Amino acid sequence: MNYITFGKGEKPLILIQGLSTRSIKGAAFSVAYMYRMFARDYKVYLFDRRENISDSITVRNLATDIAMAMDTLKITNADIFGVSQGGMIAQYLAIDRPDLVNQLVLAVTLSKNNETVERTVNDWIHITEQNNMKRLITDMAEKMYSDIYVKRYKPFMSLLAVLQKPKNVPRFIALAKACLSCKAYDELD
């Protein structure tokens, strides 16, 4: 499992990103720059999803992967920040391994699916299977960002479709399907 780490602080901060078309490999500088506000107070870690993913992987399995990585690096009592699919993973991390979690911050995520999420994720899977990357990137942007943001960057969608095209299409589809496995609601305190 690839990961990025930066920061000079003593406290560990685990960032768990959302569903992405690409891995974090080669993105250390840009990630460290985007999250530089945490670098003074925290030792920041951003874990990628593992390379080889089965078609039946769940967000709970992804949480287990992060727990194993944290165990390997001897990270405990960390502040956890999960965004979107990363928030789903973070919830299972807190449920299954509370010893690893000091504080949990969740953003734009859910603890159980609804019809909108199921329809959206299934659309992304179908679009990806059709190899229509411009449509995938445009649809993801329209669903994830504000109208103002999308309008501002609309001229760049063709370029983003090339830059953000999944390098490993089956991996992306498996990770998208994993979003549909989130059922943490009844296990949360």
Which residue ranges define each predicted feature?
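Short glycine-/acidic-enriched loop or helix-start segments at secondary-structure transitions
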Residues: 24-26, 56, 90-91, 115-116
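Conserved HGGG/HGGXW glycine-rich cap/lid loop of the alpha/beta-hydrolase fold
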Residues: 1-53
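Gly/Ala-rich beta-loop-alpha elbow adjacent to hydrolase catalytic centers
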Residues: 82-86, 90
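Conserved alpha/beta-hydrolase catalytic His-Asp/Glu region
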Residues: 115-118, 133-187
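Flexible "cap/lid" loop of the alpha/beta hydrolase fold
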Residues: 91, 95, 101-132, 171
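Structural signature of beta-strand start/N-cap positions in the alpha/beta core
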Residues: 12, 43, 77-79, 100-103
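Alpha-helical elements of Rossmann-like donor-binding domains used by nucleotide-donor carbohydrate transfer enzymes
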Residues: 33, 61-68, 123, 139, ...
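Active-site loop/oxyanion-hole signature of alpha/beta-hydrolase fold enzymes
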Residues: 31-81
